[in-house]
Amino acid sequence: MLKAIILIGGPQKGTRFRPLSFEVPKPLFPVAGVPMLQHHIEACAQVPDMKEIMLIGFYQPNDELNRFIYSAQQEFKIPIRYLQEFAALGTGGGIYHFRDQILSGGPAAFFLMNADVCSEFPLLEMLQFHRQHGENHCGVLLGTTANRTQSLNYGCIVENHETNEVLHFVEKPSTFVSDIINCGIYLFTPDIFAHIGKVFQRNQQEKIQEELTHGRQMPEVVRLEQDIFTALAGQKKLFVYKTQHFWSQIKSAGSAIYASRLYLKQYHQTHPERLATNQGGTPKITGDVYIHPTANIDPSAVLGPNVSIGKGVTIGGGVRVRESIILHGAVLQDHCCVLNSIVGWDSTVGKWARVEGTPSDPNPNDPYAKIDSETLFRDGGLTPSITILGCNVNIPSEVIIRNSIVLPHKDLNRSFKNQIIL
């Protein structure tokens, strides 16, 4: 028997995803036409003997989350429930807090994954790898290869090349340690809770001492990466399974467009029915495009590559859309152009208007390059990135919006470039 836990964070997390996370919890943001979390759940549902999927986070229960859980349970025929943390407890603290629920029924092992990663999720391969390495270890980490410079932005894993044992783990080192990075997808046995428990007890002692000595409240946080993996490395307790498949983080809104491209490409193998095709009376499709069945699109529009069109979207004649996500209820009027952008819910782009961003893709000449987590500002100016229109933004006709972020409910009356429009 197996279970899966997905860590979905909370409203204080994912701030780099604003203004899109104002309207919907980040894990429910649509990537390649379906909520981000659905890609995880689809992968979990394909694992034999998977009995339950748990979502752990500190969002208040809300209608969107409840609707998503209900529809996912109906579609995948597997129990899914949300466990709400009383505070942000960290990647290890959350699962330790709910250890009784996770261990109920006696699972032999459980998957743990972060919601903000995009991957092919090789869960079956990880399970087979786990079984090949015997009974005595307590976890398998999914790893991938990054280049030397970008590896410093991730948890770095030093492995024994013959046995794949994790010998050393450092979270975001200041100097180069290894080009194998942590993907945020794990397979644990119940033994992991004994190790988390030791750290939790030690932290409790330090917390009490700190409060007695200085009167400061310390959060009850246990971090898997810094507190658990670093301590267990080199003790034959952790192993790393290296994947050659695609993997990326989804930290910023710009990375959502890149993740959408990866998933749309994967649909050729997994869900070809989700990809739009060129047929009579339909818009011209170039490359991989997802179109919701309720969207109303003029046949003279040209879409793709890497375009996702949401529910109830209206697209007029002569419109060009490329490398973009168009969200629920948006209207693109005749002959407008949308490139490298996310158009928010119920927003309108006027006739002959142009909404354009700068792609934040990995270096195409480096096979191990990852997407850069750019800071919003650099050298006193806004870093050029994709353009984001928040919910219910109105772009008038013949206006150009380039490399800008527009917060929700704005009626613009002129062109903007490299600005955050509050």
Swiss-Prot record:
Pfam families: GMPPB_C (PF25087), NTP_transferase (PF00483). Residues 2-253 are annotated as: Substrate-binding domain. GO terms for biological process: GDP-mannose biosynthetic process. GDP-alpha-D-mannose binds at residues 85, 249. Residues 358-386 are annotated as: C-loop. Pathway: Nucleotide-sugar biosynthesis; GDP-alpha-D-mannose biosynthesis; GDP-alpha-D-mannose from alpha-D-mannose 1-phosphate (GTP route): step 1/1. CDD domains: M1P_guanylylT_A_like_N. Disruption phenotype: Morpholino knockdown of both gmppaa and gmppab results in muscle damage and shortened motor neurons. Residues 275-422 are annotated as: Hexapeptide repeat domain. SUPFAM superfamilies: Nucleotide-diphospho-sugar transferases. One of its GO terms (cellular component) is cytoplasm. PROSITE patterns: HEXAPEP_TRANSFERASES (PS00101). The keyword Translocase does not apply. Keywords: GTP-binding, Nucleotide-binding, Nucleotidyltransferase, Transferase. The keyword Transferase applies. One of its GO terms (molecular function) is mannose-1-phosphate guanylyltransferase (GTP) activity. Component of the GMPPA-GMPPB mannose-1-phosphate guanylyltransferase complex composed of 4 GMPPA subunits and 8 GMPPB subunits; the complex is organized into three layers, a central layer made up of 2 GMPPA dimers sandwiched between two layers each made up of 2 GMPPB dimers. Belongs to the transferase hexapeptide repeat family. Regulatory subunit of the GMPPA-GMPPB mannose-1-phosphate guanylyltransferase complex; reduces the catalytic activity of GMPPB when part of the complex. Mediates allosteric feedback inhibition of GMPPB catalytic activity upon binding GDP-alpha-D-mannose. Together with GMPPB regulates GDP-alpha-D-mannose levels. One of two paralogs (gmppaa and gmppab) that may have redundant functions. The N-terminal substrate-binding domain adopts a Rossman-like fold and has a binding pocket for GTP or GDP-alpha-D-mannose. This is Mannose-1-phosphate guanylyltransferase regulatory subunit alpha-B. It comes from Danio rerio (Zebrafish). The gene is gmppab.
